[in-house]
Swiss-Prot record:
PANTHER family: SERINE/THREONINE-PROTEIN KINASE DOA-RELATED (PTHR45646), SERINE_THREONINE-PROTEIN KINASE DOA (PTHR45646:SF11). One of its GO terms (cellular component) is nucleus. The gene is lkh1. Belongs to the protein kinase superfamily. CMGC Ser/Thr protein kinase family. Lammer subfamily. It is an enzyme of class 2 (transferase). Its EC number is 2.7.12.1. Residues 362-682 form the Protein kinase domain. GO terms for molecular function: ATP binding; protein kinase activity; protein serine kinase activity; protein serine/threonine kinase activity; protein serine/threonine/tyrosine kinase activity; protein tyrosine kinase activity. Protein kinase that may act as a negative regulator of filamentous growth and flocculation. Appears to have a role in normal cell wall and septum formation and in cell separation. May have antagonistic function in the regulation of beta-glucan distribution between the sites for cell wall and septum assembly. ATP binds at L368, G369, H370, G371, T372, F373, G374, K375, V376, K391. The active site is at D488 (proton acceptor). This is Dual specificity protein kinase lkh1. Autophosphorylates on all three types of residues. InterPro entries: CLK_kinases, Kinase-like_dom_sf, Prot_kinase_dom, Protein_kinase_ATP_BS, Ser/Thr_kinase_AS.
Length: 690
């Protein structure tokens, strides 16, 4: 079965199309650029000159159809009936550039069928005035009609033309040129003259000031030839000579005559026709760009010597980090012939001997500290003449791998912050000596915990808490910007640059107290630091400073460091650790006692082993059957966070508000380290050090 194809065997019934009047609204779709015309293709618009306007006659049986082409604008403008018998069509025309940059090529109009030829119509400013949107102006569209069809048209509306000059694009090179030094001859173009009493708004301030826009609608106006203002030389493209006026046609609806000129298409896509006076124009000078909205303004060409490159964008405070992939540790050979067992103990720790040589460059002074990772010793550098701290890891493969990770972190920090503005420990040297990876750093004073312990666990002054916490938040925010999570923040890993202090005795206290002279700190111990995009172990952080999401098995990220800072601040304020426990259920019960109940949604998302810590009502299942009485009594004696900071002081109230934003169970809703730096607690001046 053959599919039926719709064919147009006869001309469309335009009388039936216009039986309800002219369409009230026109939707115009304009392409970004008109297609290039070729000599083999017909032009999308008419190329013959615009003749005198003749009001259309209503259709009747006594009026035969004309032999010329009929172009009917769908917006109700006048139809044009040029006759080939009275007017000779030109075989070619001067090429023009339209608004889209299309160069129509010369062609033979007579070679095309009569129904393909369109006739331009005059521009009507009140086109599409039947639209329900009074400020929507579109140029009239022209549809070709067969010669035998007589459209039904309304009386012609009041024609208007724009009152300003329309810019014309660059013509083809074969047109006659006029010297730039010679002032252009300005023709008499039709100018819009509106009675001031009937103008809805000042014409010089109306929004339709661009060359492709139109005057306001519904404005009765009168056409009359007038002289436009004189333009500066080489400003706009002007006609080389004036054109002879065509015969004017007197309309009954207009009080004066209308001068019709030749029409030049501005856009073939929209079929917009603008009245012009000459088919030839003078090209502009070289290197002069004339925008459509400012075609009458002189634009000075820019020379190469006047060019100035744009300013470079300022680098951000914390630029995107470049992670160090792997560190190649140089090996320092041992010159002695002793057995390696004489330097290490059974656990792989290095035996520290004061006044002994170390790595052929350093002299051991004393032991500073030790831990599961290894030992920290104070040495004298014979090359620089300064004391330094050397972290000597255990000669066990897993600790060696951990030290390589720490070296990667320290090198990443050093590359991102060479001036050490963010108070992190700086890497000075590293090497492999006797199967121990050694990390050399500057020598600092006590840790915050050591100073607190040496001060009989007396709380720090509020002013010092403000200074210490601000530096700590800044260091952690810097690490987070590098994609690093410290995971082991505690007072032991916060070093004082100098532990110099003074002892004071307050009259209302029975004991003396040490007060630091300087609160400058350095953040240390990056052995557990983890890049955000790398493997995360299930359990991190020291027990007292561990975040709840780690205990519940929900995974961890940057917020776990913020929780640890909150625990440090409470310890600086009270002198005691906030969560003194070593068991998960007791730890969760302490959080519930001090900070409030857990979120039911967070409990449901926790691991199956962690859900056994809670009852069906969402409370922590504690005490257990094997819980000692001492632990139960201690937990019952705990105070809430508001009771701990129940001091009538605005500074303490601000610190409490900051801690409430830190101790949020949901890590997504917890304040970040960068946001904490903007908290009012750090901008509040605290006068007294005590």
């Amino acid at each position: 079965m053959h599919s039926l194809k719709r064919r147009r065997n006869h001309a469309p019934d335009w009388q039936d199309f216009y039986k309800n009047g002219v369409p009230q609204e026109v939707i115009v779709i304009e392409d970004s650029a008109s297609p290039r015309l070729t000599p083999n293709l017909p032009p999308p618009f008419s190329v013959h000159q615009l003749q005198s306007f003749v009001p259309p006659q209503p259709p009747s049986s006594s009026s035969p159809s004309t032999t010329g082409t009929v172009a009917v604008p769908i917006n109700g403008a006048n139809a044009v009936y040029p006759s080939t018998n009275s007017v000779s069509l030109p075989q070619s025309y001067d090429p023009w550039l339209d608004a889209n940059g299309v160069v129509p090529l010369p062609h033979d109009v007579a070679s095309h069928p009569s129904y393909m030829v369109q006739s331009p119509t005059s521009y009507h400013a009140c086109s599409n005035n039947q639209s329900p949107f009074p400020h929507s102006h579109h140029p009239p569209l022209h549809n070709p009609l067969p010669v035998s069809c007589q459209p039904v048209l309304r009386p012609p509306p009041v024609p208007q033309v724009p009152s300003h000059w329309y810019p014309v694009s660059l013509p083809s090179p074969n047109l006659p040129h006029q010297p730039i030094s010679k002032p252009p001859v300005i023709p008499n173009l039709p100018k819009l003259q509106v009675h001031p009493n009937r103008l809805p708004h000042p014409i010089h301030n109306h929004p339709y000031s661009s060359p492709t826009s139109y005057p306001p609608p519904l404005c009765p106006a009168t056409y009359c030839p007038s002289n436009p203002p004189q333009l500066a030389p080489a400003t706009a493209i002007a006609p080389s000579s004036q054109s002879s006026q065509h015969k004017s046609v007197n309309y009954s609806v207009t009080p004066s005559s209308i001068n019709n000129h030749t029409a030049v298409p501005l856009s073939p896509t929209l079929a917009v026709w603008l009245p012009m006076t000459q088919p030839t124009f003078q090209p502009p000078s070289a290197n002069v760009y004339q925008p459509a909205s400012n075609a009458n303004q002189v634009i000075t060409p820019v020379s190469i010597s006047d060019y100035r490159p744009p300013k470079k964008r300022k680098r951000a405070a914390w630029p995107p980090y470049k992670k160090v992939d792997r560190v190649n540790v140089p090996v320092v050979h041992d010159t002695t012939a002793f057995d390696p067992s004489t330097f290490d103990d059974d656990d792989g720790h290095y035996k520290v001997v004061p006044n002994s040589k170390f790595a052929n460059r350093y002299t051991v002074v004393r032991l500073l500290g030790h831990g599961t990772f290894g030992k920290v010793i104070q040495c004298y550098d014979q090359s620089t003449g300064r004391h330094c701290a050397i972290k000597v890891t255990r000669a066990i493969p897993k600790y060696r791998e951990a030290s390589l990770i720490e070296l990667r972190v320290l090198q990443t920090i050093a590359h991102s912050d060479p001036t050490n503005e963010n108070k992190c420990i700086q890497l000075r040297d590293y090497f492999d000596y006797r199967k121990h990876i050694c990390i050399v750093t500057d020598l600092f004073g006590w840790s915050v915990f050591d100073f607190l312990k040496n001060n009989n666990y007396i709380p720090f002054p509020l002013k010092h808490i403000q200074m210490l916490s601000q530096q700590l938040f800044k260091s952690v925010a810097f690490l987070h910007s590098l994609g690093l999570v410290h995971t082991d923040l505690k007072p032991e890993n916060v070093l004082l640059v100098s532990n110099a202090s003074r002892t004071i005795r307050l009259p209302y206290r029975n004991y003396s107290q040490k007060v630091l002279n300087s609160c400058e700190i350095r953040l240390i111990d990056f052995g557990s630091a983890t890049f955000e995009d790398e493997y995360h172990s299930s359990v991190v952080s020291t027990r007292h400073y561990r975040a709840p999401e780690i205990i519940l098995g929900l995974g961890w990220s940057y917020p776990c460091d913020v929780w640890s800072i909150g625990c440090i601040l409470v310890e600086l304020f009270t002198g005691q650790a906030l969560f003194q426990t070593h068991e998960d259920s007791e730890h969760l019960c302490m959080m519930e006692k001090i900070l409030g109940p857990f979120d039911r949604n967070m409990i449901s998302r926790s691991s199956r082993t962690s859900q056994r810590f809670f009852k069906s009502d969402g409370k922590v299942r504690y005490p257990l059957s094997n819980t000692p009485k001492k632990s139960i009594n201690y937990l019952q004696s705990l105070q809430t966070l508001e009771q701990i900071f129940a001091v009538s002081s605005p500074e303490v109230a601000l610190l409490l508000d900051l801690l409430k934003k830190v101790f949020v169970y949901d890590p997504k809703r917890r304040i970040t380290a960068k946001e904490a730096l903007w908290h009012p607690f750090f901008t509040q001046p605290i006068s007294s050090n005590l």
